[in-house]
A protein has these predicted regions:
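Glycine-rich, proline-tolerant flexible connector loops at the mouths of alpha/beta enzymes
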Residues: 28-54, 115
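Histidine-acidic metal/acid-base catalytic patches
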Residues: 1-4, 9-21, 89, 97, ...
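Active-site acidic/histidine proton-transfer and metal-coordination neighborhood
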Residues: 56, 71-176
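Glycine-rich, aromatic-flanked loop segments that form ligand/cofactor-binding clefts
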Residues: 50-64
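Conserved beta-strand positions in the central sheet of alpha/beta enzyme cores
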Residues: 26, 63, 108, 143, ...
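Active-site-proximal loop/turn and secondary-structure-junction residues that shape catalytic pockets
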Residues: 9-11, 29-31, 67-70, 111-115, ...
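N-terminal small/glycine-rich loop or linker at the start of catalytic domains
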Residues: 1, 63-78
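A short acidic, helix-capping loop that chelates divalent metal ions and anchors anionic groups
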Residues: 33-37, 72-77, 115-118, 150-153, ...
Length: 280
């Protein structure tokens, strides 16, 4: 299984990450507040320049993270789906097309939510339906991520069953699930059980250690809130074909040498989970 790492703050380190042993990068598009920049004419060339630096280092784009509106902020506009779509849909359509231009076919997304389960689902069904033609045109899979809302609360997108509602509704090769292990833990969900429930619908991972009520983005095995060996074994059991993608953050203020040591440790941990088991 390929091992990948999110690209936040690592732009100069791509050759070093390849040397450590990483196979790919989880490419994060800019934050929601940069809408004008994303929709500008020169945005594509800027993104593709970064992609070329990654490719020149011998790394692939394992998956992307589409621009999202953070769940802890006040809702966009009046909080209705119409306001969310008006702001986000043009961004998402452009980024899906760019994903394919980076030779990647997997895009994680944070869906819309509000207090009402029915209205949340109604809005998201509209959103995905409007994204489907572009997803199909470019051969990109939309991987719906489990997320939380204000105060780490439930937003009808926290469980495997929440994600499978959309996968089962569309029954499309272009709609799957992204399991964020840290988000699962903070919502007191078991990532091992989530993998088993998602099965073949699981297309992407955001792997990181966490504890309930936080979003720490530490390497796997650093916090014992998950049986990581069982987690990896569950991935194999369901036939997961994506990358073991770690969405981790080095402590702020580290030197480049220390940052690389952090990523070397993380890669070694991931690799150790994949070692053949000794026969008893």
């Amino acid at each position: 299984m390929d091992i990948s790492i999110r690209n936040r703050g690592i732009d100069p380190l791509y050759p070093d990450l390849k040397q450590i042993g990483f196979d790919g990068v989880d490419f994060g598009f800019p934050g929601w507040e940069r809408r004008e920049k994303i929709l500008a004419e020169d945005f594509e060339s800027t993104i593709l320049q970064t992609y070329r630096r990654i490719a020149d280092a011998g790394l692939q784009i394992s998956q992307v993270h589409l621009t999202y509106y953070p769940g802890h902020l006040p809702p966009l506009g009046s909080g209705t789906y119409a306001d969310f779509e008006d702001y986000m849909l043009p961004i998402l359509l452009k980024e899906i097309a760019l994903t394919a231009k980076m030779n990647c076919h997997l895009a994680a997304i944070h869906l819309y939510f509000e207090e009402s389960l029915e209205k949340s689902r109604e809005g998201n069904l509209q959103l995905i339906q409007k994204l489907l033609p572009t997803l199909e045109e470019h051969g990109v899979i939309l991987a719906i991520e489990n997320i939380f809302g204000p105060g780490f609360g439930d937003v009808h997108l926290s469980t495997a069953e929440d994600l499978l509602f959309y996968v089962d509704h569309f029954k499309s090769d272009c709609v799957g699930a992204c399991l964020d292990t840290g988000h699962a833990v903070t919502r007191k969900q078991n990532p091992v059980e989530a993998v088993r429930k998602l099965g073949s619908a699981l297309k992407a991972l955001h792997v990181h250690s966490n504890v309930s009520g936080h979003d720490l983005h530490m390497p796997p095995c650093m916090i014992r809130s998950v049986d990581w060996q069982k987690f990896y074994d569950a991935l194999l059991a369901v036939g997961y074909r994506g990358a073991f993608n770690m969405e981790i953050s080095p402590p702020a203020g580290l030197s480049q040498k220390a940052t690389l040591a952090f990523f070397t440790l993380a890669h070694g941990i991931a690799e150790s989970l994949m070692l053949p088991k000794a026969e008893s």
